Amino acid sequence: MKLSDRRLAQRFSLAIPLYIRAWKSPAPEQKVESVNVSECGAYFETDTPPSEGTMMQIRLDMPREVTGDPTVEWRCTGKVMRVQPARFPGTLLGVSVRFDYYEVSRTADSLLALASSGRI
């Protein structure tokens, strides 16, 4: 079975900022860029990958192209499922995170846009 056949949700090829850190870590967030995102997880590249099995906190702003609404912030908790080696020497490592939990919150600007359109 192909990996794409096992996926539970549509993946969007989006290069958006992700703010990540190990669950309950006092360390500051690390900013990385997504390669793709779905409602079930995210894939990103980094030069300092977490270990497989690490629980992560991830924060991102999901764009209108995905949600159909003004930008909303997602706060996610997930588990690192896979760390892939760099494709070429000197490039970044790939990290796959499965979301176990997420909250979606609208920003004040997005709430105003929804209210002015009569959608809330």
Regions found by a protein language model. Give the residues of each.
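Structured alpha-helical
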Residues: 1-120
